[in-house]
Amino acid sequence: MNKMSHSEEFAAGEMNAIRASVWQLLSSLYAKELSRERICELAGAELWQAFAAQVELQASASQIQAALAHAAKYDASQGGDDARLELAADFCSAFLQNAEHCAAPYASLYLGDAGKTERNETASYDTESQDKAARSLYGEKHQLMSDYLRSAGLGLDADFREPSDHLAVILGLMAHLCTSATEESQRAFLESAILSWLPEFNARLGKLKLESPLYGALGDFTLAWARLDTELLGG
């Protein structure tokens, strides 16, 4: 293999930093509800327009920007907090309800035994199944991500009280790998830890009846970005 020139190394490093920033942004959007300041910051960001220039991201990026701009403009014009509270309610409905009724953002619920229960197309979801899903949140996938974090010298914020297989944690770890791991390692993690369950998660998210299109579009964007990043890594 030919050694890269300094200019090629710089370009690769710059691209990896950009990729890392996208993954980190997505991680933050799944981690907690948006504050008024964060809504205004993201609504005015030019990055959504930049994303919209990429055909795979165009539709979802435009929807995200429009939803954020609407929320920021509405609250500013009304001098209130109604749009922010609506988005907070959507966040709760999308990610914080019982796993039967939301798109629970935990890898454990889509992979392994719990995932098999979750993928059942029938409407039944008995107490035993719920207990099994609850136990799995701190089971194998949680432990696997905890091990990943430790090996990378990372940890969770004290105020983030979620299992390590939460989507926000996994996306944050992907951001870290963009600038610290080989392309082969990044692609392997992306395929095994993210794309192995993200399509099913996004399908569930898309079926929810939410007030704003923000989180549905966020799910579409996340999946499209994950697939695009796999291509960037030569997958």
From Swiss-Prot:
GO CC aspect terms: cytoplasm
Location in the cell: Cytoplasm
Keyword annotations from UniProtKB, A to Z: Chaperone, Cytoplasm
Superkingdom to which the source organism belongs: Bacteria
A biological process term (GO) from this entry: protein folding
SUPFAM superfamilies per the UniProt record, alphabetical: TorD-like
Main localization of the protein described in the UniProt heading: cytoplasm
Entry-linked InterPro entries: Chaperone_TorD, DMSO/NO3_reduct_chaperone, HscB_C_sf, TorD-like_sf, TorD/DmsD_chaperones
The family this protein is said to belong to: Belongs to the TorD/DmsD family. TorD subfamily.
Xref: HAMAP family: TorD
Function description: Involved in the biogenesis of TorA. Acts on TorA before the insertion of the molybdenum cofactor and, as a result, probably favors a conformation of the apoenzyme that is competent for acquiring the cofactor.
Protein name as it appears in the record: Chaperone protein TorD
